[in-house]
Amino acid sequence: MSLDAMKRKINSVQTTAKITNAMKLVATAKLKRQRDRLAAIKEYCHDYYDVIGLLLSVVDDVEFLKIPNAKDRTLYITINSTMGLAGSYNYNVNKLISKIVNETDITFTIGKKGHDFMRLSGRVDQVNTYLNLNDNDLTFDMSLQIAREALELYSQGEVNKICIIYTKFINAITFEVSVIDVLPFDKTALIKDHLAETIELAKDNIIFKPNKFELVKKILPTYIATVLYGSLIESKISENASRRNAMDAATKNAKALAENYKLIYNTLRQGKITREITEIVAGSDD
């Protein structure tokens, strides 16, 4: 290989390292912004779930929410990314989709990568809606819109269960694809131990108007939207953390490759200089 060709390789790899490092910095900034966003709504979500738990504790039976003769299939709201270069983030989500989503189930895909996966796997007919997941799209209003569409299918008996597939953020390097059962209610998950005293007071002192059953029905859209909104933000945090880690690894690999190319370049240049000196010496001897 010529010196010019090797120099082009070095420049190319160094340019790649600059690009991946810039992408790492962007992902880091987005990660911080989304983590701040999650922290801002965390207390609200916890309090809201406590209210739901309190309400369910005084509802003896939630069977009234089940639709008679509903089709035995599930609506999955899946959360992927719109952009690529996020390590194994989308692969892990799609792997779980392949494992648990049946041919008869319906899917709301959020994120272009999820839509593309459903299309390539021949499941595009199952997809009821498709939305991008850019930062500007990440709003409670969007979550409420999806929640109402999901609840409409549930109310019509098209599905008998609603679940969310999202990526749970554990720490900066660990993420876990998880499933949340949204409907029917999981009373054991929502009625927490710390609510015991409040529940006892509620049984005799809280009046529900028009009645507790109608109240449960009224809060369903905002309940689903709240769960979905939290899942969207947590998935976005996991996506940006995964992309930051991937770009960090790519930058380090590119820099290491550039160093190796420099060694090869220096070896080639030294060999060329040695040959030139040898030729000069040989010519002077003649």
UniProtKB/Swiss-Prot annotation:
InterPro entries: ATP_synth_F1_ATPase_gsu, ATP_synth_F1_gsu. GO terms for molecular function: ATP binding; proton-transporting ATP synthase activity, rotational mechanism. It is a peripheral membrane protein. GO terms for biological process: proton motive force-driven plasma membrane ATP synthesis. One of its GO terms (cellular component) is plasma membrane. Keywords: ATP synthesis, Cell membrane, CF(1), Hydrogen ion transport, Ion transport, Membrane, Transport. The keyword Ion transport applies. Its main location: membrane. It is found in: Cell membrane. Gene3D superfamilies: 3.40.1380.10, ATP synthase, gamma subunit, helix hairpin domain. The keyword Cell cycle does not apply. Pfam families: ATP-synt. Belongs to the ATPase gamma chain family. HAMAP family: ATP_synth_gamma_bact. Produces ATP from ADP in the presence of a proton gradient across the membrane. The gamma chain is believed to be important in regulating ATPase activity and the flow of protons through the CF(0) complex. F-type ATPases have 2 components, CF(1) - the catalytic core - and CF(0) - the membrane proton channel. CF(1) has five subunits: alpha(3), beta(3), gamma(1), delta(1), epsilon(1). CF(0) has three main subunits: a, b and c. This is ATP synthase gamma chain.
